[in-house]
């Protein structure tokens, strides 16, 4: 369900077969932002009521970085978020695929909290190399949830461009946004 948008397995117990369907092959807008019909309507008919919609018709706007800045704290050499993080929508959107998890319900409901629809795995022995790098695929949300960075309000999109998956800055520059060089 992470390599296709709106994947439905549709197991048929009578025939012991799956009738799998999907909306789009690969990750598309709706995988993270939810159903797009309201967004399409917003774009087609920009009436005064819809033009003012700050979320542009998206179910999940994922705009937690908007208006946020990382302010250096001289005493620690690190930075703190200002204003503090108001929610975890971005993390939940990323965790749909970037977490070891087991679904508790069928399908993805963008209106519900991911932690109510999935059981997330946390740190387990053998999953990481001694230097902290992952041994397997990019299932890193469980460890991120237990990190100091998460506790400080860092989100996935502070470091990663959500549309490309690449780091926002090259090399150590991404870390230097918040951490002063030693």
Task: Enumerate the language-model features and the residues they cover.
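Primarily the internal scaffold of c-type cytochrome electron-transfer domains
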Residues: 6-158, 162-182
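An acidic-aromatic substrate-binding cleft motif
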Residues: 1-3
């Amino acid at each position: 369900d992470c390599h296709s948008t709106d994947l439905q397995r549709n197991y048929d117990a009578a025939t012991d077969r799956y009738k799998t369907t999907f909306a789009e092959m690969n990750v598309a807008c709706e995988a993270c932002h939810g159903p797009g019909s309201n967004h399409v309507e917003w774009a087609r008919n920009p009436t005064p009521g819809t033009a003012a919609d700050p979320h542009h018709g998206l179910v999940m706007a994922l705009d937690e970085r908007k208006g946020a800045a990382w302010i250096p704290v001289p005493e620690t050499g690190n930075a703190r978020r200002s204003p503090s993080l108001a929610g975890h929508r971005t993390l939940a959107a990323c965790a749909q695929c970037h977490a070891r998890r087991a679904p508790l319900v069928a399908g993805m409901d963008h209106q519900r909290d991911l932690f109510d629809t999935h059981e997330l795995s946390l740190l387990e022995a053998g999953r990481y190399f001694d230097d902290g790098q992952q041994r397997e695929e990019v299932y890193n949300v469980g460890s991120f949830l237990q990190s100091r960075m998460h506790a400080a309000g860092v989100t996935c999109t502070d470091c990663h461009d959500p549309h490309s998956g690449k780091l926002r800055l090259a090399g150590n520059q991404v870390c230097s946004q918040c951490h002063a060089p030693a």
